[in-house]
């Protein structure tokens, strides 16, 4: 589900980037340029802490959160 969301957001951003090339901006207006990664994080709302994997023993909800890719669901902890 999360990967589908990331792919969907990536496609959405690609369409926006392509359409922005054809749009004209008002003269003299300086807009901050964002990398695709920054724009994606702003849309999804991810912070630096959420992007880093969790170590063994740390709290988790799904396996993708753990560095080991294993989350013991009933204890809600990353395991080896």
Swiss-Prot record:
Keywords noted in UniProt: Disulfide bond, Ion channel impairing toxin, Knottin, Neurotoxin, Secreted, Signal, Toxin
Residue ranges that the Swiss-Prot or TrEMBL entry lists as coiled coil: none
Claim: Secreted is one of the keywords in the record: yes
Residue pairs linked by disulfide bridges in the UniProt entry: 53-67, 60-71, 66-78
GO terms of molecular function: ion channel regulator activity; toxin activity
Proregion residues excised on maturation: 25-46
Signal peptide: 1-24
Entry GO terms, CC: extracellular region
Tissue-wise expression: Expressed by the venom gland.
Location in the cell: Secreted
Other remarks on this protein: Negative results: the recombinant peptide has no effect on Kv1.3/KCNA3, Kv10.1/KCNH1/EAG1, Kv11.1/KCNH2/ERG1, KCa1.1/KCNMA1, and on the drosophila Shaker IR channel.
Family: Belongs to the asilidin-1 family.
Domain note: The presence of a 'disulfide through disulfide knot' structurally defines this protein as a knottin.
Biological function: Neurotoxin that may modulate ions channels (other than those tested). In vivo, induces neurotoxic effects when injected into insects (tested on L.cuprina and A.domesticus).
Name this protein carries in UniProt: U-Asilidin(1)-Dg12
Species this chain originates from: Dolopus genitalis (Giant Australian assassin fly)
């Amino acid at each position: 589900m999360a990967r589908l969301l990331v792919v969907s957001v990536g496609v959405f951003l690609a369409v926006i980037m392509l359409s922005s090339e054809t749009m004209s901006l008002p003269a003299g207006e300086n807009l901050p340029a964002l990398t695709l990664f920054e724009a994606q994080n702003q849309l999804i709302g991810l912070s630096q802490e959420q992007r880093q994997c969790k170590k063994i023993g740390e709290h988790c909800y799904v396996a993708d959160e753990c560095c080991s890719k294993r989350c013991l669901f009933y204890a809600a902890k990353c395991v080896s």
